[in-house]
A protein has these predicted regions:
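NAD(P)-dependent Rossmann-like dehydrogenase/reductase catalytic/cofactor-binding core
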Residues: 26-87
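Active-site-proximal catalytic alpha-helix in oxidoreductases
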Residues: 1-19, 32-40, 44
Length: 87
């Protein structure tokens, strides 16, 4: 479930975020492919990147300001889980 079903939900939420932009979901495919390929060579924890991994509160606060309530909750929970594992 974590490796597939929840991942598909994240793709759906990303597509929803792009809905009102002129950016097609297909623009994310190289990033998605690169992310999936990394775990063939690295442990998932070692492949983790992003503002929560760097503990970049400024970027995370900017992201949160752009999200709706549901998106903020999901973003916050996942970011805290990443930060907890990288202390």
């Amino acid at each position: 479930v974590y490796a597939c079903n929840f991942t598909n939900l994240m793709y759906t939420m990303a597509a929803e975020l792009l809905k009102n932009t002129h950016i097609p979901f297909s623009a994310l495919l190289p990033l998605i492919d690169e992310t999936a390929a990394k775990i063939h060579a690295l442990a998932p924890a070692d492949a983790q990147t992003g503002p929560a991994r760097r503990n970049d509160e400024n970027v995370m606060n900017h992201h949160l300001a752009l999200l709706n309530d549901e998106q903020r909750v999901v973003y916050s929970i996942l970011s805290e889980a990443i930060k907890k594992r990288n202390r």
